[in-house]
Amino acid sequence: MSNRKYFGTDGIRGRVGNAPITPDFVLKLGWAAGKVLARHGSRKIIIGKDTRISGYMLESALEAGLAAAGLSASFTGPMPTPAVAYLTRTFRAEAGIVISASHNPFYDNGIKFFSIDGTKLPDDVEEAIEAEMEKEITCVDSAELGKASRIVDAAGRYIEFCKGTFPNELSLNGLKVVVDCANGATYHIAPNVLRELGATVIAIGCEPNGVNINEEVGATDVRALQARVLVEKADLGIALDGDGDRVIMVDHEGNKVDGDQIMYIIAREGLRQGQLRGGAVGTLMSNMGLELALKQLGIPFARAKVGDRYVLEKLQEKGWRIGAENSGHVILLDKTTTGDGIVAGLQVLAAMVRNHMSLHDLCSGMKMFPQILVNVRYTAGSGDPLENDAVKAVTADVEATLGNRGRVLLRKSGTEPLIRVMVEGEDEAQVTAFAHRIADAVKAV
């Protein structure tokens, strides 16, 4: 990564009211982005958002900045991140902008850009936008100012797109599904997609009020979904996150099915159908069980850095079509250009229906290794914990003990001041102790 001032691994993100998520900054960001994007000739930008209360304020600021640079904005209203990527492609817009902090609490928000082809903006374009941010805002001539409009039935367009990724010859008739929309951007989309494909749907997390997004619901907290699946005696549960780019599932017994297992099911089904091209891409956090299960099927596996943009880069580098993070970002390049929770969930449902198998049974070919993750908050500017000699020594000792039957990974979060300590191995008690031992060393820095 280059030394960029504002853009992180997933756009610009922070606490609302604190720099950079302030009205004046976002107005200037809209202007700077408009100046850079206008060089490519198009004058149209798609703007979508999740259900955070701050989205109203930030979309107004963005639109004002874009208009000053001479670009027009088309609003989608609350819409999943992958829907904005899709609409950007279908409208041939110069870019799409999503106002969301994904799985974070309501008091955070962020700005993320898509290019004309529905993929994340290249680094050099983000750098050009940052360079424009250092200049004084100017305004185009009045006759050249941008306009604002709303996209008619944006939700309906995306619902039809999602349904189109599900095989025409299959139906969800007879399946009882609980879907948890995290009080986020999929609340008016996912239940309708599933119902229209024939499922009996129980929807939770579908009452957004601006401040309850991701609050004890959604892909980052599946406890409510697990409980509801058991109470309803449902066939499965589907949990999406606040902006709909992640999916975590729950089987009929209430067991959590994460992004690694979801990718395993989709990759294996692709192999069975003769549609798998190449291998599958995971990340440094992907479970060793996934790697071993894919190897047994003869499916090549590669690891990318953590972050869906790096999974996508690795897919493009290898010419493969399927990648995922264990957090639930699943990228299926034969269907879409970015992580799409609804579309990924539909492919798992298709495998269930086609094979007459439960979600639990579809997961049975993959044995998950115990993987313990401990997050340690650190103070920026107090030295790099990853370069500390004591931390390095403890880590090396743990790695030597695990040998080739486990892994240790220490990395910084791309969005928060956290060190993520991950230890993986065959014995859960052992890896838990090792993870906390390393975490204690990090805390002592």
Swiss-Prot record:
It catalyses: alpha-D-glucosamine 1-phosphate = D-glucosamine 6-phosphate. Keywords: Isomerase, Magnesium, Metal-binding, Phosphoprotein. Its cofactor is Mg(2+). One of its GO terms (cellular component) is cytosol. The keyword Isomerase applies. One of its GO terms (molecular function) is magnesium ion binding. NCBIfam families: glmM, PRK10887.1. This is Phosphoglucosamine mutase. The lineage of its organism: Bacteria, Pseudomonadati, Pseudomonadota, Gammaproteobacteria, Enterobacterales.
